Amino acid sequence: MEVPSEAPSGEHPDVEPSPHPRPARANAGGIASHRRARRLRRLAGLAVLMAPTLWVVTTDFLRRGRLLLAFDRPHALGYLGSVVESLIFWSVLLHVAARRRGGFSAGVAALFLLLFTLAMGIEGAFHAFYNIYLSMDGQVHSKSIPWSIVGTLPFSRPIVLAHVLGAFVLGAGLLVLARRFVRPSLWPRRITPLLVPFALYAVIRIPVSYRTLQSTPFDMIYFHGVAAVTREHLGITHDSPDLRVQRREPDDVPAMTARPARPRNVLLVLQESQRADVSCIDYEPDCKLATRFTNKLLPGRFPLRQLRSNASTTAISISNIWSGVRPTERRDTLHSVPLLWDYARAAGYDTAYWTSQNLMFGNARLYVQDIPVSHRCVATDLDSQSDLDTGASDSLVSDRVIEEWGELKEPFFAVVHYSNVHFPYVYDEEFAPFQPADMDKSAEKNEEFKNYYRNVVYLSDMAVGRMLSYIRDTDAGKRTVVVYTSDHGESFREHWQLGHTSSVYDEEIHVPGWVDAPPGTLAPEEEESLRAARDELVWHLDLAPTFLDLLGLWDDPGLRPFRDHMMGHPLTRRERTTEPVPLTNCTWLWECAFRNWGMMQGPLKLEAREWDNEYHCFNVLDDPDELHNLGEQACAPLPDLARSTFHVMPNITPPGRPHTDWGKK
């Protein structure tokens, strides 16, 4: 019996050797190729996990690289730290979402796509619209969490839709790539799902730089803002206890036909916090007050020496000016009435709005976000790091108007809205003729502080004067009627308070006003009416009717339904507003932290503040400093009308509002 020989080492005795054995070198090459493929797949997987944060950093540099490179060391380190936070957050979500099986993985994948689309799409669209990222400032005042999540942006605008859809497609693509290239090994596959809740918690709790510098990647700023508005709605925080501006939904304005008394353009120049008594309202050859530049430029203007705002709060005041509607109207009315731009556009006018105001303040952007304009800029367009209170430099908005003025098509209606006279004020020692001046709010330094304010008005007026000088030298400027006023005034302890929004005393509501019209832009009867208005008591509620008359729309049948809500009268016509006029800093457009309101009829003014349980009565012509209270009965029937209009005295705590002992604070 033959015994089979022993098989060579490494070969099975029952398997016949291949007639074409694989060379050892070929086997080694296959293994190396396989290892290279695995390394490349791992590198590709790592790149996919890093891609969301790389997208954030890259697009951020494309939008504002110069500003990022200018960060000082602490802010640069803060930015880098937030980049690491972003990297961990997106990597954890995408790592878990890369698994092809399991309900948890599918849920995290959906969450990743949702958060990626919102953070990248909404922030990209918001920056394209406002030159700044959406932050807590632009979200916390929203009364709707869903709208705050999408930045209350106008999705009818192609630029908004493009950013959001682009982010969705990119996020979906990253999920596909993750499931192809990210192959978690056993332990990472078990551990990363446990990190998801910690990652989500971290991005809503770790502080961010969300104002001015925004030295945090925008995805982290976005999640911080969403968390802030959610906590506000849940009552965990009270950063926005009072109602602020919400998005308007204006009624449709029918097509109208403009029939102005003379062919003309109309321009409103709106100042901020400027008192009447620091302004040369009449032309004065040797003006000693703060508005020397505009005074010298327009000697033939029609002064309005007794013009008063109906509020000393900007948001309420601009509503009064631009809508003509009483500030005491219902909330739905205040958010649905058209504004001057809506009427002008319905009549075929070109329209513009330029402002140095930072409209991130108190949701103010929502009031003008949807106005129909061909030219528009806000503070963050001019300077993305503009101050929330003082805005961008008034000089910058004048530059923008000068740059774009020639692009407007006549006839047009435009508004230039300044900002730097708002506290804490924009001051330049090189342009400060009022001395001694000191930024010191202590009582013993009150006059120096007021001089500081005068110098601020002087500097801002320089920017206004430069803009108007340019406009008057253009062909279109020679056909443009200019109306000038301020949203409200500013108090300096005349009645124990500083600033504005705190009362309806004259230091806060008596404002400068004038109309300047080149030859041939007004009819003789319009000139006569404006000349007669010099010393007559007129109101901001008269300005919207005045603009509509200048635009040739006041008598249009299409305007009649909207005129029913307007109580004012055109200053270009002889009829004046003689009925009682509401004055208030508390409305359904903008609630007040310090309650105050009143009424006026002719020279008689009724006012009350947070601590008052009865009204005070003054005659502002006989007693311009409002030092002698005449008693409620001297203003009859205004006290009864005020109680009917405002329902309670300011010292009554409204239901649902925490009681505050104002006598001790």
Tell where the protein language model's regions lie, with residue ranges.
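Substrate-binding rim/cap in mid-to-C-terminal beta-strand-loop elements of soluble/periplasmic
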Residues: 304, 311-322, 441, 499-576
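Active-site-proximal alpha/beta segments of enzymes that process anionic O-linked groups
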Residues: 200-268, 273-440, 551, 568
